[in-house]
Amino acid sequence: MNKQKTRRPELLAPAGNMEKFFTALHFGADAVYLAGKNFGLRAFADNFTLDEIKFCCGYAHEKGKKVYVTVNIFADGRDLEKLPDYISALDNCGADALIVSDAGVMQIAKSVAPRLPLHLSTQANCTNARAAEFWRDAGVSRIVAARECGFDDLVQMAALKDCELEIFVHGAMCMAYSGRCLLSSWLSGRGGNKGECVQACRWEWQVSLTEREHPDKPLFLNEDERGVYIMNSRDLCLMPYLNRALETGAVSLKIEGRMKSAHYVGTVVNAYRRALDACLTGSFSKSVSDGLLNELKKTSHRAFTSGFLFGKDFDETENFFTSKAVADGNFVASVLDWSDGVAAV
């Protein structure tokens, strides 16, 4: 058994704006990850000003929670010029760690904020223990494993001394290794590695055969009349396998979704909070899992998959028939206050 298993795992939730930040903490997250207005790979989220980040750090710390700030772009020279002051400001805000993927960004962070812990982003595609060892020796204190890792690789990475392991348990997945896809840049001029991905992989694609002498007469190979979604990933959901996920030795269980709604954040965090607590008390069961899985299905989602945890064929991680998200429930309202049995919505 992995020796790190005895540590109470952290439930880490996304926060795309202030409302989602409060929602995540209220429903049981131990920590949140968020981004400033730049450098955070979610350019279309509301994100946070430095003053807001400082407030969030103080608020979270009062409740014994943590705040991690993403600075996980793949930087160019212009970015590097602005990063020293920005990272220094994040350190002064009280951030508990930076999530980084670029070696240059990491070097700057170590120079201007040497006491600020560095977490290696999943964008860096760390898939094995030797790579994790390399990044640890470079100054990283936590590895956010690539979503493509299998169980055995995660166990080996978690066993590495002086370096923690964080794994994703829920949320959207990419058809490529994170950060390695150029479809968005090619088709729209918006770079995924700058936080502007348009998710071109989820568009309706057509495969065709074209004869050299007759380029104006392509033969389309359609799955049906709507086309085929050959690169459309399902959503990760490890709810039914949460006990097994804990057996990897990961110290942090991460939920994807900084671009998702407050309803999504609250529902998913609440479900995994209850599931994780049940695992830690020995009361997690199929009936508990099934009930919480039904809660998760009330949020906007695509067909679920356990990803690569146990090794999966391509057709078990992709949805070839539709890229549309579904939900088994309807969002009604947010409760703003509760007093004397009356809710303000």
Enumerate the language-model features and the residues they cover.
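Beta/alpha (TIM)-barrel catalytic core signal, keyed to glycine-rich beta->alpha loops juxtaposed to Asp/Glu
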Residues: N125
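Alpha-helix capping/helix-boundary segments
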Residues: G104-V105
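Conserved nucleotide-cofactor-binding alpha/beta core module
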Residues: A129-R130
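Surface-exposed amphipathic alpha-helical tracts and adjacent flexible/coil segments at the periphery
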Residues: M1-H26, A31-L34, N38, C56-C57, ...
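Glycine-rich, positively charged N-terminal anion/phosphate-binding segment
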Residues: R42-H61
